[in-house]
Amino acid sequence: MTAILERRESTSLWGRFCNWITSTENRLYIGWFGVLMIPTLLTATSVFIIAFIAAPPVDIDGIREPVSGSLLYGNNIISGAIIPTSAAIGLHFYPIWEAASVDEWLYNGGPYELIVLHFLLGVACYMGREWELSFRLGMRPWIAVAYSAPVAAATAVFLIYPIGQGSFSDGMPLGISGTFNFMIVFQAEHNILMHPFHMLGVAGVFGGSLFSAMHGSLVTSSLIRETTENESANEGYKFGQEEETYNIVAAHGYFGRLIFQYASFNNSRSLHFFLAAWPVVGIWFTALGISTMAFNLNGFNFNQSVVDSQGRVINTWADIINRANLGMEVMHERNAHNFPLDLAALEVPSING
């Protein structure tokens, strides 16, 4: 009898826990994805803060030349970064217990791998949590679909690219100047500016910003006046009211006359679908481009493609970009190799005598 009562109590406790986890009445929804999201993001954030402040230099290139990234080792907010895991580690899973000591783990850049893997798991769970809350509330799942774009972008630069290049040392450093360095080296090695998927991403981000600004300014400018001319239009509204606060017909008419009739949406759902889909699809393409360039399927190469009747090269902008790429490539990882692959000889010259 006692055992039965204990089992009922245990089941009841588990049931209450399940109800609390999945309750939409909590101030912040937790959800089953949140059970994994909370510890992973807390771990990534905590280690990032500690390492950004106090991590010792990391031997990123695996040539016994450590690079300093933390504040206590001479950096500031702009130059500081979490230095990627050493090329000596490559793609090996490198938790603390795989190193001979914590000092060795820090020297080889263990914190970078720890932060990145926990972060990617955390943001993936955040996306799942968005779907889960939408499901509980009877909503459609497109919020999580939209969030998949930045998740895909982060996964591309932190996981897919290192896998393709064979080492976590090629991942994006976690810092401001480190991000810019990653972009410059990526251009030098993969010619990303000449990749059509990157072009689609630029159109998505800049176009999304333009459309967002246009939509926000149109809505704000076409409020339905609920007040007299002598008082502010803002006085006619309450936050969260059910009634619409702007006139889409007026906005459609304004924009249709500003450009042309069919450049303007007269359906609110179509408009907002477009506002969501444009940047999301663009960022999807950029993430796909990074993931293909990770395996060295690079941007277009139009170098020396225009010649005169004598066979002399007439330089185009492609040749200017190529010269810049070579300059950037010979400058990075300056002590890891004498020449970049582009400038290395195909065959070792024979030596007589």
From Swiss-Prot:
Molecular-function annotations in GO: chlorophyll binding; electron transporter, transferring electrons within the cyclic electron transport pathway of photosynthesis activity; iron ion binding; oxidoreductase activity, acting on diphenols and related substances as donors, oxygen as acceptor; oxygen evolving activity
Family of this protein: Belongs to the reaction center PufL/M/PsbA/D family.
Cofactor note (record): The D1/D2 heterodimer binds P680, chlorophylls that are the primary electron donor of PSII, and subsequent electron acceptors. It shares a non-heme iron and each subunit binds pheophytin, quinone, additional chlorophylls, carotenoids and lipids. D1 provides most of the ligands for the Mn4-Ca-O5 cluster of the oxygen-evolving complex (OEC). There is also a Cl(-1) ion associated with D1 and D2, which is required for oxygen evolution. The PSII complex binds additional chlorophylls, carotenoids and specific lipids.
SUPFAM superfamilies: Bacterial photosystem II reaction centre, L and M subunits
Residues reported in the UniProt entry to bind Fe cation: H215, H272
Lineage summary: Eukaryota, Viridiplantae, Streptophyta, Embryophyta, Tracheophyta
PROSITE patterns: REACTION_CENTER
InterPro entries found in the cross-reference section: D1/D2 (IPR055266), Photo_II_D1/D2_sf (IPR036854), Photo_RC_L/M (IPR000484), Photo_RC_L/M_CS (IPR055265), PSII_D1 (IPR005867)
Top-rank taxon, per record: Eukaryota
Gene Ontology CC, one term: photosystem II
Site, Cleavage: residue positions: A344, A345
The organism of origin for this protein: Agrostis stolonifera
Binding site for a quinone: H215, S264, F265
Binding site for chlorophyll a PD1: H198
Catalytic activity: 2 a plastoquinone + 4 hnu + 2 H2O = 2 a plastoquinol + O2
Gene it is expressed from: psbA
Stated name of the protein: Photosystem II protein D1
Site entry: Tyrosine radical intermediate: Y161
